[in-house]
């Protein structure tokens, strides 16, 4: 991973903004006024909408006083306000990217000036069957906008010849109500929509093996379409490097055997299987190769901001456009720090990613990049969908008494169970730091059974963790969870 040109100074009383994304002088003045008003409101005991801290694009640090600062955490759909010791806290967020002024126009421009291939209009004709993959309910993809733009570029293709594939991977099928929220009645009423099922062997076709031996079983109907298109959104991924692009083929539309091999203990445990790394990442290398084997004809990816608004669109050859999108997302999300922190407070980016504890491991993984060994990670994730109840995650956790025992089991020869990859990453994190979890959707006993420490009050928990760490203890907050990927500058890869 090449070093990013984001010079940061993490001194206690200094602040430097990213040169590339420096705010205009007027916006700086507005931000300063808002911050001063916020402090005045705190001093007077007043809480108003304006009392929330200014969301700086890079870092907000304490000013050396004993006052507390209010930080808004992404939690469920409503968020969670937490008051933290101002002199201790460093808040790190992605570079502030405004929404594009016209999402439809931005998508159309990308589709008509694609990267690495000819425009979609020139690649499709009447009578062809079209397959389009989209993310499942756990992802905040703007599906309707992307599909609408694609439909405009396929004027001669009737909706009855288009099938939308929900790229669930090994996740559960999405319900009718969820599909309506995701796609809308118009698309549901005019296009065929299919939930992919990785366990339904009759719906799969064997394509071959990758150069590393991964058996490639993919959705048969997707493969048999005349035109295969993927849509997604790109953000850092905790072991695949980045989401979107080729991941919308595998694991998105892959069979269970393929997913299990892509996510085996050796690949997940590889040092390059991490946030923001693609080249040399064994997971991403295989995923790219699978997409090439399939022959995807066109791909559309977007990047999003905190409000789940489109900030950029990319289209064209699945690998070339994805590489461009990854570069853009990396500049937004990857933030360098000089030293690890005693305590890191994180989230799982709010709804829909924080629907369950399984997904919350991603937020913990982001925090683990910069927490001191023996430190504490505090994770606030709503988990309205529980563990969840489907899948093997809960059963694996219940099968062993400690994270150490879980890792030993997963790394033992011949062990292979769906969802083991999430438990593997979770256990690796827990060997480095204590993990304390705030959730509204799980009981304290359920959190404890998952080998975490349950908490009710985030601020009190942070205070206690800082006290245990001793004088001069440091605190970092990732309000947007894995939308921000901090890393130690010394750990940069080329």
Name the predicted role of every residue range.
Residues 57-109:
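N-terminal amphipathic/basic leader segments beginning at the initiator methionine
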Residues 129-140, 163-169, 345-347:
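Short glycine-rich or small-residue beta-strand-to-loop segments that form or flank ligand, phosphate
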Residues 140-158, 360-370:
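Histidine-anchored nucleotide/phosphate-binding helix
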Residues 174-242:
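An acidic, phosphate/nucleotide-engaging active-site surface
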Residues 273-351:
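Membrane-embedded hairpin module used as a gating/binding unit in multi-pass transport
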Residues 354-436:
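C-terminal catalytic subdomain
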């Amino acid at each position: 991973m090449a070093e990013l040109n984001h010079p940061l100074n993490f001194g206690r009383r200094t602040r430097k903004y990213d040169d590339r994304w420096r705010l205009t002088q007027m916006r700086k003045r507005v931000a300063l006024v808002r911050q001063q008003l916020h402090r005045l409101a705190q001093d007077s005991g007043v809480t108003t909408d304006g009392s929330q801290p200014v969301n700086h694009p890079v870092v907000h640090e304490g000013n050396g006083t004993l006052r507390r600062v209010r930080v808004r955490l992404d939690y469920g759909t409503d968020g969670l306000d937490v008051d933290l010791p101002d002199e201790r806290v460093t808040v790190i967020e992605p570079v502030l990217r405004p929404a594009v002024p016209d999402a439809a126009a931005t998508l159309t421009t990308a589709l008509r000036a694609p990267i690495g291939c000819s425009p979609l209009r020139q690649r499709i004709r009447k009578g062809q069957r079209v397959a389009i993959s989209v993310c499942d309910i756990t992802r905040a993809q703007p599906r309707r906008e992307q599909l609408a733009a694609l439909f405009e570029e396929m004027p001669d293709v009737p909706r009855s010849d288009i099938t939308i594939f929900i790229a669930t991977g090994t996740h559960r099928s999405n319900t009718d109500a969820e599909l309506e929220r995701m796609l809308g009645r118009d698309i549901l009423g005019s296009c065929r929509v299919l939930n992919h099922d990785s366990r339904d062997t009759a719906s799969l076709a064997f394509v071959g093996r990758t150069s590393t031996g991964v058996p490639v079983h993919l959705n048969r109907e997707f493969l048999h379409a005349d035109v295969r298109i993927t849509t997604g959104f790109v953000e850092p991924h905790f072991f695949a490097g980045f989401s979107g692009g080729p991941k919308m083929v595998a694991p998105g539309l892959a069979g269970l055997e393929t997913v299990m091999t892509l996510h085996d203990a050796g690949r997940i445990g590889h040092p390059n299987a991490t946030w923001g790394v693609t080249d040399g990442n064994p997971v991403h290398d295989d995923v790219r190769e699978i997409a090439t084997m399939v022959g995807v004809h066109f791909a559309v990816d977007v990047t999003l901001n905190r409000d789940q608004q489109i900030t950029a669109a990319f289209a064209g050859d699945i690998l070339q456009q994805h590489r461009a999108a990854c570069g853009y997302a990396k500049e937004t999300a990857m933030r360098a720090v000089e030293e690890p922190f005693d305590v890191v407070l994180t989230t799982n980016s709010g709804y829909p990613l924080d629907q369950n504890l399984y997904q919350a491991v991603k937020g913990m993984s982001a925090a683990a990049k910069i927490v001191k060994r023996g430190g504490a990670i505090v994770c606030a994730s709503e988990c309205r969908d529980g563990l969840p109840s489907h899948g093997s995650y809960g059963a694996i956790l219940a099968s062993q008494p400690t994270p150490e025992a879980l890792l030993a089991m997963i790394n033992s020869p011949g062990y292979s169970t769906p969802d083991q990859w999430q438990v593997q990453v979770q256990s690796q994190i827990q060997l480095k730091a204590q993990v304390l979890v705030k959730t509204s959707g799980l009981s304290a006993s359920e959190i404890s059974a998952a080998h975490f420490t349950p908490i009710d009050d985030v601020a009190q928990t942070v205070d206690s963790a800082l006290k245990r760490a001793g004088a001069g203890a440091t605190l970092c907050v990732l309000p947007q969870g894995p939308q921000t990927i901090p890393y130690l500058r010394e750990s940069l890869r080329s």
